[in-house]
Amino acid sequence: MPRTLAGRLAPLLVAMGLQGMILWVPVEKLFMSQIGFTPASVGVMAAAYAAVVPLLEVPSGILADRWSRNGTMVLACVGLLVSSIIGGLSHNVATYVVAAMVLGVYFALSSGTVDSIVYDTVLEETGSSDLYETWIGRVRIVESVGFVVSALAGGVLAEATSARTAYFVTLPFAAAAIIAFLRFDEPRLHRDVEPTSLRSHIALTFGTILRRPEVLQLLLLLALVGTLAQAVFEFGPLWLVALAAPAVLFGPYWAALMSTLGVGGYLAAKLDLTRTPIVVALAVVTPAATVVLALTRSLAAVVIAQTVLALLLAVVAIHAGRLLHDAVPSAIRAGVSSGAGTASWVLFLPFALALGWVGREQGVPRTGWLLTGAALLLGALLVVSVRRAGRASEPARPEDLACRELVDLVTDLLDGALSPAWRKGVEAHLSACDGCTEYLRQIRTTVEALGRLRAHTVQLPP
């Protein structure tokens, strides 16, 4: 394993661990009740938060692609800082709703950006994406450790002081995360393509999402993964309430769910998800876990089933993310990846309403059947997507010929001798081909070095 890759990603790992130290999360509902929230006002806050994230996710991804992914993550941490400050200073519902909306900006800015950073860094350092799942898995492990530690420490801190204090103690961790992000050497692949207008970039991003069936299929798969995962984290505790679980169980239960993000990251790097039997096993066990939730009245079985479900979803999310990154060029990678988050929110809102209605009318366990339906569709999409990706990885003659044609045109491209029509075609090919983009970057670097050498030679005295 390349040592330079480990050293380069070390600041990113530190930043993600610090960013996960949000100490107020475990006591948020307690604090909200203290400042006057009712079930109705909680719904208003959730609606405001849910409206912000999907609206900003794709635009923030395009910002990351055109400007700086590191800079976008710094802005995300600033959003977390501002949200925590407003939340900690809140004494009424209206102010806290503003804090929740700013937190939505934080999630929108970070959605899809970290995955794109890791993928391009691995690609730059190793020349392939083979180690992507290993390193994004390590990122998820570090992030999970931050979540678990903050979940336990936040409760202890609130008990010793107050829930409000947890908001302010979060601030130094978010500030330290900004410093760590600034120390990270961001990959440059997404900047090597010839700059295009914002309008062209947006058109290419949405065109890739809407007109390429394999990309649309992967986005739907990731959206289903996100919807199910969010359903587990948002509605999972209701099973414990329905089964009259003791209060002492909620802390370890939540820590177990948080730990699945890290364990899932570890397993995603170890499991060979290009093998059909393993993929089919995931596609079968995932809905089986939801069936247990629908049928059992055992508290232990519910906790185990939810933990297994969250773990499997974490594994699938990482592999599906790699398939998506493999399918799109670096220049639009963060924007397209953010589209999965947007689609997840669009699916989750009606799904959450359906879960709430079924839970109220027929009891919480019956909502497990809705999860089963979504899990079956997820399993089918997973199998189809992996098989499709396997076929797509075989060398294709037309693409090879297109790359050879571009190599023949490089001289005219660098000399500015291409006609506008040919130049547009070359730029379109570069936007979809990381290999040719890297080749052109190396040629330009060589030409610049030769130019500097020639200038130095001319200036030498006789």
Predicted regions mapped to residue ranges:
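C-terminal ends and interior cores of transmembrane alpha-helices
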Residues: 78-92, 96, 284-297
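Juxtamembrane intracellular "pre-TM" segments in multi-pass secondary transporters
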Residues: 1-6, 185-220
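Hydrophobic core of transmembrane alpha-helices in multi-pass small-molecule transporters
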Residues: 17, 83, 94-110, 301-315
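Cytoplasmic helix-loop-helix junction between adjacent transmembrane helices
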Residues: 99-144
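Helix-loop boundary and gating motifs at the non-cytosolic
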Residues: 2-55, 88, 212-258
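C-terminal transmembrane bundle of multi-pass solute transporters/carriers
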Residues: 2, 43-45, 54-58, 62, ...
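Helix-loop junctions on the cytosolic side of multi-pass membrane transporters
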Residues: 170, 174, 178-196, 384-393
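Conserved MFS/SLC helix-loop-helix module at the cytosolic interface between two early adjacent transmembrane helices
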Residues: 53-92
